[in-house]
Design a protein with these regions (language model features):
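Short acidic-hydrophobic, aromatic-tinged amphipathic segments that line or gate anion-handling sites
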Residues: 203-207
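Short, glycine/polar-rich helix-capping loops at beta-to-alpha or helix-loop-helix junctions
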Residues: 188-198
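Substrate-recognition "cap/lid" segment bordering the active-site pocket of phosphatases
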Residues: 84-87, 113-166, 170-179, 193-195
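Metal-dependent phosphoesterase signature
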Residues: 31, 55-94
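Helix-loop "lid/cap" segments that line or gate small-molecule binding pockets
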Residues: 27-28, 48-63, 120, 152-153
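Short, acidic loop-to-helix structural element flanking the phosphoryl-transfer center
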Residues: 80-108, 114-118, 146
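Active-site neighborhood of HAD-like aspartate-dependent phosphohydrolases
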Residues: 1-43
């Protein structure tokens, strides 16, 4: 029986793509660089903000100094506008409350910067729904490396044999599997069925309630 569910953030709990794309395109426009569609941004996110910035920055020039400056621009812009269009996916708040009522603890593990994770989760979900919220931190490898996930499970006392990881991308499925956990794909997120299936998702959720059903069957 699953007793702990660890969630990815972007594309799983929250639909953040419009605010991420707007911030990225704002930076691009400031420099006269090409901009991108929201659909294109869906395939740029997932590996952390530094990698996102690298992906939307032109290859020439792409020096470490330029990338660092662009990262600072993006981070400031996104932090100021991260709640303009972002919203929880329909059914997510209800799922979290249902899991809590059944004694299933939940936590967040994201490649988004740790301070941003805490702020955005608190804004949309308040306190009490998550045992812990952890994003990328200096010295801790990002997903799909399982090191941060191990640390999170130890922090909240999660039994690895009774823990499920849920996310919307191949990175999330790999993260769960690298940590020895079953990994469930969220079909409402940024990537879709083909990528999640190819990554070896143990199950797929078409709607958030499917996560609860999966746990009940387990």
């Amino acid at each position: 029986m699953i007793k702990t569910v660890l969630f990815d953030l972007d594309g799983t709990l929250l639909n953040t793509i419009d605010d991420l794309a707007d911030a990225g395109n704002w930076v691009c426009a400031q420099h006269g660089w090409p901009t991108f569609t929201v659909e294109q941004f869906k395939h740029m996110v997932g590996n952390g903000i530094p990698k996102l910035v690298e992906r939307f920055s032109p290859e020439n020039p792409r020096t470490p100094e330029q990338l660092a400056a662009t990262l600072a621009e993006f981070t400031a812009r996104y932090d100021a506008h991260k709640e303009d269009k972002t919203a929880p996916y329909p059914g997510i708040p209800e799922l979290l409350d249902e899991l809590r009522a059944q004694g299933v603890q939940c936590a967040v593990f994201s490649n988004k910067a740790d301070p941003l994770c805490g702020k955005i989760i608190a804004h949309y979900f308040g306190t009490g729904r998550f045992a812990a919220v952890r994003g990328s931190r200096p010295g801790v490898p990002t997903k799909p490396d399982p090191a941060g996930l191990y640390a999170l499970m130890d922090e909240i006392g999660a039994d690895r044999s009774a823990t499920l990881f849920v996310g919307d991308s191949d990175v999330d499925i790999l993260t769960g599997h690298n940590a020895g956990l079953p990994a469930m794909g969220a079909l409402w997120g940024f990537r879709g069925r083909a990528e999640l299936t190819a990554a070896g998702a143990d199950a797929l959720a078409a709607v958030p309630e499917d996560i609860f059903t999966y746990i009940q069957k387990g």
